[in-house]
Amino acid sequence: MVVSIIPQFPDIKVSLALFEQVKNAKEIRSKMSELSTSFAFIDPRLVCSGEQMYSAIYKTLIEVKYNKMRTRNLNSECVLCLSPTSNISDAFLKFGIKDDSSQLICLKFHTNTDDVDKEQLRTIMTSIVKGQEIEFNDDNLSRFYDEALIRKIYKLSDDFKPQDVNGLSRALVDAIQLRGV
């Protein structure tokens, strides 16, 4: 698990955990209404890098700062910010976990300035997600992302041929930051 602070928003911390071998995605989805205020569960097939994830987190915090939030909480706003469109239900359908998801990203915003107890948070996350937590990093994310699916969702043309995952990540970060401008 990674706990981060975005320098421009020192009062908010963000926790990110990556899970594989998830066995209860359907159960998590059925409890989403009660969990949505606490966590966001994101399909890592559509996240090719930490840079992409942090770009959506930053966009979320900007939306909050300028009172442009379109969802009920920070976690759901971040899922929307990952999306190339402004359609909330479409964002959840595409970027949220599926009943058969075997990997997921667990995201939580912490709005108080207290220290985040990583062990307590890990205990809560592992009580919800029945799977193996692995380090949230680009190497592990690269094992799960689906370039064809990303191209379809973000409507990337066949002419766009990034040389590596960094080129793809840059394009997605640009799309996230420019949406709505």
Swiss-Prot record:
Q: What subcellular compartments does it reside in?
A: Nucleus; Chromosome, Telomere
**InterPro entries xref list:** CGI121/TPRKB (IPR013926), CGI121/TPRKB_sf (IPR036504)
What is annotated about its quaternary structure and interactions? Answer: Component of the EKC/KEOPS complex composed of at least BUD32, CGI121, GON7, KAE1 and PCC1; the whole complex dimerizes.
Enumerate the GO terms in the molecular function aspect.
tRNA binding
User: According to its UniProt record, where is this protein mainly located?
Assistant: nucleus
Name of the protein: EKC/KEOPS complex subunit CGI121
What are its GO cellular component terms?
chromosome, telomeric region; cytosol; EKC/KEOPS complex; nucleoplasm; nucleus
Biological function: Component of the EKC/KEOPS complex that is required for the formation of a threonylcarbamoyl group on adenosine at position 37 (t(6)A37) in tRNAs that read codons beginning with adenine. The complex is probably involved in the transfer of the threonylcarbamoyl moiety of threonylcarbamoyl-AMP (TC-AMP) to the N6 group of A37. CGI121 acts as an allosteric effector that regulates the t(6)A activity of the complex. The EKC/KEOPS complex also promotes both telomere uncapping and telomere elongation. The complex is required for efficient recruitment of transcriptional coactivators.
Does this UniProt record's set of keywords contain GTP-binding?
no
